[in-house]
Each structure stands twice: as C-alpha cells, then as structure tokens.
Design a protein with these regions (language model features):
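Amphipathic alpha-helical coiled-coil/heptad-repeat segments
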Residues: 4-7, 11-29, 33, 40, ...
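Alpha/beta-hydrolase superfamily serine-hydrolase fold, recognizing
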Residues: 45, 52, 64-406
C-alpha cells in the first residue's frame, strides 16, 4: 500500500466497523421484547446520536494521526494536482492511442526491470512489425505526470509510431513523489536504461543506439539522464549509477526543466514543485541538498548527444522552456533543434501527443522526422517506416478508417 493511502484505508475500515456495530445495536434494541415503544424511540435516537459522534471523533483522530505521522517522517499529502493529472490523462488516453498500427505491433507488458522496497518497477516493450535489417534502434520513453503520476498506456500512440518506424520502444515506470523525492526517480530511469543494455540480445536492440524521450516531468528526467550519462561527477554527486552507454539522442516534449522557473508560476509552485523535493517554500528549496543538481541547466555539457525539444506557445506549465533549453544547449556546444507550436488553441502542455488534432500531428511529425534524420546519420535506414508514420499524420482520418494503407 502506498504511504498516502494508508490512513485513508484505515479510516474506511474503522468506519465500516462502526457501521456494523451501529446496525448490531439497532437490531438488539428492536429484538428486546421487554422494551416499550417509548424506550425504543429514545434508544434509537440515542444510538443514532452516538453513531454520529463516533464517526466525527474517528475522522478527527484519523486526521490527527496522519498529520503527526507525516510531520515525523517528512511526508507530504498526495497533491490534488496528481488527481487532476489523472483525470485529464485518462480522458485523453483512448483517442491519443488510436493509430493504424495498433493491431500489428506486439507488446510485451509488465517486464520487471527493478525491485525496490518490495515494489516492482516495470516497463512495456513495443516490437516493430516490420523490423529493419540488423539490430534495431531503441527508444526509451519516460512518461510525464508532474513527477507524481504516470501510466504507460497513456503514451501508447506515441510509442507505436516509433515502433512503426522500426524501433523497439520501452515505456517505463519509476517511483513517484511524494513517496520518494529526486534523485530516486532519476535513479530508476538510469536502472531501466541499463536493464535494456543488459538485455539487448533479448530485445534485439543495439545498446549503443538508445534514444531517450520523455514529456513534461519525463522531459526533465530525460535531460538529467543524458547529463548523468556524460558527466560521471554529476551522477556521483547524486549517488546514482551512470549509464552503460551514451544515449544516441534525447527528445523532450514540453520538458519541465527548471524548478526556479516553476517557482515563479503560482500554479506550478503551489501544486507541483513543493512535492518534487519535499520543500514547502522557495527558501527551503534553495537550501535543499539537491537544489543545484535538480536543475539540468546547471550541468549542460558539450558531450551531450543531439537533442530535440518540443514546446507550445500556450503551455502555461512550462512556458518558453523549449526555446530556453535549446539556447542553453547551443551555448554549451550541443547539436539540437526545437519546435514551438503557434496555434492559439492547440499548443498547450504536451500537445504533440494528441494526435486527433491537426496542429499536434504537424509538430509530432516534425519530432518523428528529427528522429528519422538522427538514425540516418547513425547509418540506420528507417525511410519506409517513417513514410508510414508520415502518411498517418497527414491523412489521419482516412488512415484510421483503413481507406489508405500506411
């Protein structure tokens, strides 16, 4: 059971116990043959009043115990933003996952890559239906969700398009805030990457050709993983392992890179940032042990692989981060490209993952085109697979109806 669920579960159990006791006492009162009608009325009224008072006292005591426990162990409540993310992500999951490749691409689900504190961390692996010659390139996807939620199935369409191009795609889980704080989530991502390297033969991949991608908080972890892979001192300062190989590329979709930037935005400050580090104020955050390391801007280096950043003009969670990161990468001597969506209504947070909308497909195609060119530079021909994805993106409705072949 997750820490934030413990007290709620116990409260529900105790409330059910009270209800059963109330029902038992009411039955006993009604079955008492010696009680008069007046006694029954008074008894029923007294039992109801006692039941109501006991429920109120139970709720108060449960909250008191939870507050005391969280204070002693430095825990934070599961933030309301996590529930908001859950609601919207679940609503978008089905339409975003519709592609003409759904029936042909095989998925190996729930592959355990790590067990920590009794919890199994897993990944889903997508295999291309039309493999390219030789070992396949690999794409490792870190789903976003404010570092607080993630669901591998919600990146299904995004992953299938990479697989349709000819890549083996691994969509991973990692531990979440506020149960753990940075850099434990980054450590899980590095371990997932190394698991793919250790099992390259099993998955049929080239461990020297793994591209890492992530959206929102996953974009942040993607960039931090790239830094850990190219700067051993950074990994050592966090107490995490480095990657066995250098990633071939990094793709960040609406990457939430800088907590300093997010602290300036009231929405992200109140609902997200404090839960990532466990620090409730900006002053406390700046004194946090991993304050400097949590911001990838502080550690960009010329050894980073080629990078691609996608952002939206109306992204109020990570406004301007795609261009800001691109400028910083260029200054550090890193080959990179970026795209910022300009559509007033369809350029919000992680909009490129929403394939039903034409502006999203246009910029998603630019992302897949960048990956196609990256692999071409590495000597991998994905032209046939990219053509299939291009046809799908440009003729979306006809492709889904089967009127044209992808």
């Amino acid at each position: 059971m997750k820490q934030y669920e413990y007290f709620a579960a116990n409260y529900r159990t105790d409330k059910k116990r009270l209800k059963r006791q109330f029902a038992h006492d009411m039955v006993a009162l009604l079955e008492n043959e010696n009680a008069s009608i007046q006694d029954m009325r008074l008894g029923r009224k007294a039992l109801k009043a006692q039941y109501k008072a006991d429920k109120k006292a139970l709720k108060k005591e449960s909250k008191r115990l939870e507050k005391s426990f969280r204070k002693d162990f430095g825990m934070l409540r599961r933030p309301i933003m996590a529930d908001i993310f859950d609601f919207f992500e679940e609503d978008r999951a089905v339409p975003n996952g519709k592609t003409p490749f759904n029936d042909e691409i095989k998925i190996e689900k729930d592959i355990v890559y790590k067990t920590v504190d009794g919890k199994q961390l897993v990944m889903d692996v997508y295999y291309p239906s039309r493999p390219i010659a030789g070992k396949a390139p690999c794409v490792m996807d870190i789903p976003g969700g404010g570092w607080m939620i993630h669901n591998r199935l919600r990146r299904d369409g995004y992953a299938r398009c990479f697989a349709a191009m000819g890549a083996v795609v691994a969509v991973i889980d990692h531990r979440l805030c506020p149960e753990v704080f940075f850099p434990r989530d980054l450590e899980d991502c590095v371990d997932a990457y190394n698991f793919l390297c250790d099992n390259a033969e099993r998955f049929g991949i080239d461990k020297d050709n793994i591209t890492v991608t992530g959206d929102s908080s996953g974009g942040h972890l993607t960039m931090c993983l790239g830094i850990a892979a190219t700067d051993p001192e950074y990994a050592n300062s966090l107490g995490i392992p480095t990657t066995q190989t250098k990633p071939a590329g990094l793709i960040c979709v609406s990457g939430a890179f800088s907590f300093e930037v997010m602290y300036r935005i009231p929405l992200t400050n109140t609902l997200i940032v404090r839960y990532v580090s466990g620090q409730k104020s900006r002053k406390a955050f700046r004194n946090w042990q991993f304050y400097k390391q949590s911001d990838p801007y502080n550690y960009l280096n010329s050894n980073l692989p080629p990078c691609y950043n996608s952002g939206g003009m109306t992204d109020f969670l990570c406004m301007g981060e795609a261009k800001r990161m691109s400028d910083a990468l260029t200054k550090a001597g890193v080959k990179n490209e970026y795209t910022v969506g300009k559509n007033l209504f369809r350029s919000d947070h992680c909009y490129v993952l929403r394939f039903p909308f034409a502006p999203a497909r246009k910029d998603a195609l630019a992302l897949y085109n960048w990956y196609f060119r990256l692999e071409k530079d590495l000597g991998v021909d994905m032209s046939k697979g990219f053509k299939r994805v291009e046809t799908f993106m440009m003729q979306y409705k006809k492709a889904l109806k089967g009127e044209i072949e992808c």
